[in-house]
Regions:
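Short, flexible, solvent-exposed loop/turn segments with mixed acidic/basic and small polar residues
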Residues: 1-2, 327-328
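Classical eukaryotic N-terminal signal peptides for Sec-dependent ER targeting/secretion
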Residues: 2-28
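C-terminus-biased signal that marks the final domain/tail of proteins
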Residues: 16-21, 34-247, 256-261, 269-295, ...
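Residue-level detector of conserved, well-ordered beta-strand and adjacent loop positions
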Residues: 250
Length: 545
C-alpha cells in the first residue's frame, strides 16, 4: 500500500496556497543592508502567526489540540509562514516540564503537525510522493527496504524494553514518540501510546531518512539511485576572524530544488536525561529544517549545551562495506544525530554518543582540530573525507584513480576556492558573500577537466547545477545539468550563539548568476507546490522573543 501521508489535510484542497500558519521575530539586520536590495516588493502582507496548544483532559486523560496559547498545556507550537517574503517559515515548539517526558515528546509532534500540516503535505508531494508507493515498479527493492526498516524498528523496541543503558534508549524512544505524534496529528488520530507503539515504515519516517536512504538504496540494489556519483551535499566553513575577534560558523545545504519549502525551528523540550535525572544539556535547539522532519537534515544546529553542530555528507563509494549493514544492532543516522545533540556537553561527548550503534558502514574518527584552526584561520568541509582512514575505507582512492583531482581532499574545486577566498572574510557580511559565492563563468577554479563547456556551475561554494547546459559533455553525473545546488546559507557566531541567533538565506544563490525562477528553468516540470516562482530572497537575521 502507498504511504499514509498521501492524503491532504482534511478540509484542504490539494493545491491550496499555504494557510496562515511563531513567535520568532525576523528582522532584516542593518548589518546586511548591502545584501537586501531585492526585498519582496509587491508581496502580500504576511499572515499572522498560527498558534496551537496541546491539552491533557483531566478526566479522560485524552489529548486535545486547541487554537491559541493556553497556559496549562503539555505543548505549544507557533508558526510564522514567511516563505513568500523571505523564503523561510519559522516554527517554535515548546513543551511543559511539569509533564512526563513521553507525554511531552508525543505532544510536541502533535503540536508541530497541527500548525505545519499544509507545508508537510506539499513537501511530501514535492519530494516523496510515490516513493515505494503503488505506482513505482521497484517492488523488490521496496520490499527489502520495508523489511529492513521494520526489523530495525523492532530491534530498537526490544532495546528500549530491556532497561539497559537507559539514558540512550530514553532519548531514542522520545524521538520516535515525537515522530509518532507528528504522524498521528496529521492523520487526525490522537492516541498517546502507553506501551509499545509502531511507526509506518513508509509514512513520515521516510522524511527522516534522507542520508540513510541514499546508502540503503545502494546496499539494497535499488535500480534508480537518488545519489549521483560525485554529488555534493553541502559546504561548511568554520572561520576564526583576524586577531581571534570572533568565530563564525556557516553552512550551505546542497539539495534538490524540490526540497525548498524551508523552516527554521526552535525546539524547547525540557526532557530528563533518564527517569528522575536532571534535564538534558541540549534541551533547546535552533536548526534549519523541513516540514515533517524533526531534525535538521542539513545539518546545522545551535544547542543550549553551547555546541554548534553541522555536517557535510560523506557518502560510501565502497560496495564491499555494504555487507556490514544490519538492521539489528544499528540506530539510523537521523536518530543518533538527535540523541547526540540532546545528551552531549562537549565535542568529544558528542562523537562518543554518535558513534554508538552506527549503521554498519559507519566509521567515526574524532580529533580536536583547534590548533589547526589557529594555524590556518579556517576549517572547511565539502563532502570529501579529511581523515585518511575514512577517505580510503569509503572508496575515494578508486574515484581519484578514475577521475582525478576532483575527488581529492586538497585539490577539489571547493577546497581550492575556500583556501583562496577565506582570507577575504573579516566580518559576517564577507562570510555570507563567500558562502553564497558562485562565479563559475569567470573563476578559473570552476573549470572542469574533460567538460565541454569547461566552466561548471557545480564547482563553487554554492552550486547551481541548473545552469550547466543540458547537451554538454561531462566526465561524471554530478557535473551535468541537474535541478540541484546550494539551496540555503546559515551562519552564526560566538557572539550570537548564546541567544540562538543566526543569519539565514533561502534558495539558490543569485549574487553572481541569474536568480532561479521555476517557470523559466529547465526544472519547471517538477512538482514544486507552495514554492515561490522567483527566488531572490535576501539574508535575514533571526531573533527569538
Amino acid at each position: 500500500s502507498g504511504p499514509a501521508p498521501l492524503a491532504p489535510p482534511r478540509g484542504v484542497p490539494a493545491m491550496a496556497a499555504p494557510r496562515a500558519l511563531l513567535a520568532a521575530a525576523v528582522l532584516l539586520s542593518p548589518l546586511l543592508s548591502p545584501l537586501l536590495s531585492a526585498g519582496a516588493a509587491g508581496a502580500a502582507p504576511a499572515p499572522a502567526p498560527r498558534n496551537v496548544s496541546v491539552l491533557l483532559e483531566p478526566g479522560s486523560g485524552r489529548l486535545r489540540v486547541l487554537p491559541g496559547r493556553l497556559p496549562a498545556a503539555v505543548a505549544w507550537a507557533s508558526l510564522d509562514d514567511r516563505i513568500p517574503h523571505v523564503g523561510w517559515a519559522f516554527l517554535e515548539v515548546t513543551t511543559n516540564a511539569s509533564y512526563n517526558d513521553s507525554l511531552q515528546a508525543y505532544a510536541a509532534g502533535l503540536a508541530e503537525a497541527a500548525v505545519t500540516e499544509q507545508l508537510m503535505y506539499m513537501h511530501w508531494m514535492n519530494t516523496m510522493v510515490g516513493y515505494c508507493g503503488p505506482f513505482k515498479y521497484e517492488s523488490e527493492y521496496c520490499q527489502k527496504l520495508r523489511d529492513y526498516l521494520e526489523a530495525n524498528l523492532g530491534w530498537m523496541e526490544e532495546q528500549m524494553g530491556k532497561g539497559q543503558d537507559p539514558e540512550y534508549w530514553h532519548q531514542v524512544r522520545l524521538a520516535l514518540l515525537q515522530l509518532k505524534g507528528l504522524e498521528d496529528s496529521y492523520n487526525r488520530r490522537l492516541d498517546f501510546p502507553r506501551g509499545r507503539f509502531t511507526l509506518a515504515p513508509f509514512g513520515f519516517l521516510l522524511l527522516q531518512l534522507g542520508g540513510d536512504l541514499e546508502d540503503l538504496e545502494s546496499a539494497l540494489n535499488r535500480s534508480s539511485l537518488q545519489r549521483v556519483l560525485g554529488s555534493g551535499s553541502c559546504s561548511a566553513l568554520v572561520k576564526l576572524l583576524p586577531g581571534n575577534r570572533d568565530l563564525l560558523v556557516a553552512h550551505d545545504t546542497w539539495n534538490s530544488y524540490q526540497s525548498m519549502l524551508r523552516l527554521i525551528k526552535k525546539y524547547t523540550l525540557p526532557f530528563r536525561a533518564s527517569a528522575g535525572k536532571s534535564q538534558i544539556p541540549g534541551s533547546i535547539q535552533v536548526f534549519s529544517s523541513y516540514p515533517g522532519t524533526i531534525f535538521s537534515a542539513d545539518d546545522f544546529y545551535i544547542l543550549s549545551s553551547g555546541l554548534v553542530t553541522l555536517e557535510t555528507t560523506i557518502g560510501n563509494n565502497n560496495p564491499a562495506r555494504w555487507k556490514y549493514l544490519d538492521p539489528r544492532g544499528s540506530v539510523l543516522e537521523w536518530l543518533r544525530n538527535i540523541v547526540a545533540n540532546r545528551l552531549a556537553r562537549s565535542g568529544p561527548e558528542w562523537a562518543t554518543v554518535f558513534r554508538r550503534f552506527n549503521s554498519g558502514t559507519g566509521l567515526v574518527v574524532e580529533a580536536d582540530l583547534t590548533e589547526l584552526l589557529y594555524q590556518q584561520g579556517y576549517w572547511a568541509s565539502y563532502n570529501v573525507p579529511y581523515f585518511e582512514e575514512i577517505f580510503n575505507a569509503s572508496g575515494n582512492l578508486e574515484l581519484v584513480r578514475k577521475y582525478g583531482d576532483w575527488f581529492t581532499y586538497d585539490k577539489n574545486p571547493r577546497a581550492q576556492i575556500f583556501r583562496r577566498n577565506q582570507t577575504l572574510v573579516h566580518d559576517l557580511d564577507s562570510m555570507i558573500r563567500l558562502m553564497r559565492s558562485n562565479n563559475y563563468l569567470q573563476d578559473p577554479l570552476s573549470r572542469c577537466r574533460g567538460c565541454d563547456p569547461p566552466q561548471n556551475a557545480e564547482n563553487a561554494i554554492s552550486a547551481r547545477s541548473d545552469l550547466n547546459p543540458p547537451n554538454g559533455t561531462y566526465p561524471f553525473p554530478a557535473l551535468r545539468q541537474r535541478c540541484h545546488g546550494g539551496t540555503d546559507m546559515k551562519v552564526t557566531s560566538s557572539g550570537m550563539v548564546p541567544s540562538f541567533g543566526l543569519v539565514a538565506a533561502s534558495g539558490p544563490t543569485w549574487d553572481d548568476v541569474p536568480p532561479f525562477r521555476w517557470s523559466t528553468s529547465p526544472c519547471s516540470s517538477l512538482l514544486h507546490m507552495g514554492h515561490p516562482d522567483l527566488w531572490t530572497f535576501p539574508p535575514v537575521k533571526v531573533h527569538w522573543d
